[in-house]
Structure formats: structure tokens, C-alpha cells
């Protein structure tokens, strides 16, 4: 992709309304544009990142055995009256009427709809277990949306819902998502710590929030420092191995970790002083087991092996991809701009042509772009008629993992300069070695 033909509306000045780093950098880097309070358009660069985040989430959901579907954003109020949540949910729910005066709503969550879908098709325990997920836009009318996509009114969510015959099966489903979330966040370059949390309006008696530590976090968290060194479950983990998953969850919940709502000062004091961490955190995922809270009132029942009908046990599991983009920036940036982890970067390489119009430099850049793309790398070539300093600043701001710097002086010596954005390390390599070098780094 040539930057001269791309749509990248970079801002030179820091927007006054941006309170936190991620909001400032997403606006400055031309990733998003605010359309109304808490509502953003995702511009091309931002959308590429958002899509890469959802790819990782989808891959780990599929690996765990969850099955993707897609539910609509508009829901019937009648479903919510069945569960008893229509009046209880409050003003965050955007309530609307269609032309026939039927009461509808813009879905803030999907427990009711997924339960209705399930009950219409599943009648027997032989069709269990099931875990269904979707990735869809939601709307919650926050009183005070702030911090950009970190706390917006419209946001993208991955919601998964598990259905099991009994509590034992439901807890195994919960453990599957617990492990899938650990792997998801690690692949996104985040160190997430699962913490005991309140269930809130979702309900239930078992819940964990996945928290990343960040100075700009909206909540106070308390945990044992040992979590920072815990190993992530491998891709080879068997999600059907009940004992192995339980052992992993037991290990990841063996030490103290709690949000402020669940904090127990006496228990925290029992943690060795050198291991105690009281910090700010950002919630990047939330999982719940809520038993028969929705299946009971909504009639989602199956016939068990004894021939008796019973309500299914359910859980729900949420990750916000649009919120995650901001969280990744909060965790990975410097004074110059964003530092994208390789797994979610919008492009792998920023190819900087330092002398546009010079025949040799233009030809070298064209050849390098072709070779890099043939090697499986995505490339954004800065072919704008700008001074080198402006190109370096843009490359640092948008944070692509590698910068390939092409200028007449280096070409005269048969060399190219490479810069690793995350570390700032630079190296000089032969022109023909660039593509093999970066392909090897990606692998």
C-alpha cells in the first residue's frame, strides 16, 4: 500500500478532549474519528488493527470448541420482559419503537436472545454441551462516555454463551473460556491477570475479570506479583481434558487477585509484602457462570438421561475488541507514538522512501515492496513528497513493527537501514537481505 494513496488523516496537534494516551494516539494516528459523544468512525488504519484483534479472538474461540453465529443488534423488548431485565436494566438501554409501535431495543448484551435461539432448537441432553459466540456492535447509553474507545457508547463485543446439563458441565465450559482468554490476551501482547469480580446485572455466583495493569486504568486492583511470571497455556492444550483445564484454572487462581469491589484487606495482608501489588488496571475481559438465571424464566429446558426436563446451566464470556485496541496502546507506547505488538499491527513494515523522485530510490522501494509482500509481509510505503524527519515521525507515531529506510546514500553502498520500532535497535543490511531478514523475524 502506498501512503500517498492511503487515507491516513494524521493530526499534528494533540486533541484537547483526549484525556488518556490511547485516545490521544488513536486520534493523532488517524485511526478513529469522533462522530458523537462516545461514538466513533473506525478509519482504515484503525479498522485494520480492529480486524486483527478480532482474528486472534476468533481463532482462540474456535480452538476452544465455541461455534460462531451472528445475532442482530436490534432486539424485541418482549424477550427482556421474559427474563425480568427490561425494566431493571436502566437508562443505559436504548429503547426504540418501530413504525408499528412495537417496543424494541438496541442490544446492550445478548443473554435473552441467545437463550431464545437455544430453546427453539435444543430439546435433549444429547445435544449438549454447546458454546455459541458472536462478534457484534453494541450500544449502552453511558452517562459520561470518555477515554475514546475505552469507554464508548457504541462498541464491538465478542460474546460467548455456554449451555450445559448441570453445574459440573457448566464449570468445565467456564474453565475452557478461562484458558482461551489467557491465550487470547497473551497473543495480543498483553499480560492479563484473572481477578475475582462482582457479577453485576448479568447475575450469577462465579465471575472473573481479566485485568491488565496500566497507570491509566479505571479501577484499583490488588494482586500477588507472582502472576506476572505465570506460564500461558500452550496451543496444544486439550480443551476436553477436564482435569488439565481445572489444574490450569486452579494455578491461575491460587494466589490473591481481586478488583476493588471484591478486595479483602485481611487476605491481601497475608500476601508477603514484597509480592503485594496495588495498582490501576484495565478490564479487558469478563466471564460469568450464572446457572439457570435465564434458562429458568425463559423456559430453556432439555430432557435429561432420566427422562426428566430441567433448565440448562449457562455461562457468558465477553471480550471487547474495540476496547482492546485502546488497552493495547495503553500497554505499549512511548513518547513518539504507538508500539504495536506484531500480532495486531496494521502493517508489518513501514517502507520509507527518503528521496521520492530519485529514480534509483524509487526503483529500490518498488522492488523491496514486491519482495516483502512475496515473503508474506504487509507493507505501507511512505512515498509522500515530505522531508525525512516527517516520515520518521509518522512511522514512529503509527507504530509499525519494522521500518525499512531507503535513501540514496545507503543504496550507493548496496545497503538498507532497518529499525525495530519496539526497541529502537537499528541495523544495516544488504538490499537483497531485507526480505529474508524480516521474513525470519516474523516466523
UniProtKB/Swiss-Prot annotation:
Its EC number is 6.1.1.15. The keyword Manganese does not apply. It catalyses: tRNA(Pro) + L-proline + ATP = L-prolyl-tRNA(Pro) + AMP + diphosphate. GO terms for cellular component: cytosol. PROSITE patterns: AA_TRNA_LIGASE_II. It is found in: Cytoplasm. InterPro entries: aa-tRNA-synt_IIb, aa-tRNA-synth_II, aa-tRNA-synth_II/BPL/LPL, Anticodon-bd, Anticodon-bd_dom_sf, Pro-tRNA-ligase_IIa, Pro-tRNA-synth_IIa_bac-type, Pro-tRNA_synthetase. One of its GO terms (biological process) is prolyl-tRNA aminoacylation. One of its GO terms (molecular function) is ATP binding. Belongs to the class-II aminoacyl-tRNA synthetase family. ProS type 2 subfamily. NCBIfam families: PRK12325.1 (NF008979), proS_fam_II (TIGR00409). Catalyzes the attachment of proline to tRNA(Pro) in a two-step reaction: proline is first activated by ATP to form Pro-AMP and then transferred to the acceptor end of tRNA(Pro). Homodimer. This is Proline--tRNA ligase. It comes from Methylobacterium nodulans (strain LMG 21967 / CNCM I-2342 / ORS 2060). The lineage of its organism: Bacteria, Pseudomonadati, Pseudomonadota, Alphaproteobacteria, Hyphomicrobiales. The gene is proS.
